[in-house]
Amino acid sequence: IIGIDAKFGKLNLAAKYEFKANMNIENDTHDITAPDAAADFMAPYQNGVNTPSDLPAMLSLAASYEILPSLRASVEYHFFDDKNAGMADGKQKTLKHGTHEYLAGVEWDINKLFTVSGGYQKTDYGLSDAFQSDTSFSCDSYSVGFGGRINFTEALSLDVAYFWTTYSDYTKENVRGLGASIDKDVYSRTNKVFGVSVNYKF
C-alpha cells in the first residue's frame, strides 16, 4: 500500500494505492449429492477445486475542506481494477471496465454535545451479460446515509447511523433463446443498514 496525506490550511488532500493481492480459494467439500446429469454444473464445488479470487488493485483519491470550524465537507473517488483481478472462469474479462465509486459527505457539529452527518455513494461496476449468473452477480447502485454522534464527555460518545442502498436491476433478455418477452433473468437486491456504536478514548 502506498499513501500520501497533505494538509493545506483548511484543505486536506489524500491519495492511496493498494496493489493487487493474488488469492486462490480451495474447496473443502465433504459431501455432494446430485444426479449424474448435473456433474458439469457441480464440478466447481467438488472438493479440492481451486478458484481464483484476487483482491483487485485499488486507487483512492480524496479531498476534504473545513468550511467552518463546525462544518466539514469531503469528496472521494475509488477505482477497483476488477478487469485485471482473477475470478472464477476468467469472468473478469467480460467486464466493460473496472469499478468506479463516487462519494461525498458533510459533517456538522451542532454544538459540543451533538454532531450530525450525511453522505452519498454511487457505484458503477461495468457489468455485462456474461459476467452475471445465478450464483454470482452484482448491481450498480447508489447509497444515502445519515448519522449522529452524542458526546457525553471528551472520552465517551455514542454513534448512531442508518443508510440504504438502491440497486439498479440488471436484466438479461432472451436468455433461453425463446424469443418471448418473458424469457429474461432479472438480477436485483436491496440493502438497509442501521448501526450503533459506543466509543471511548483512553
Segments the model singles out, each with a brief description of its role:
Residues 1-202:
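Outer-membrane beta-barrel porins/channels
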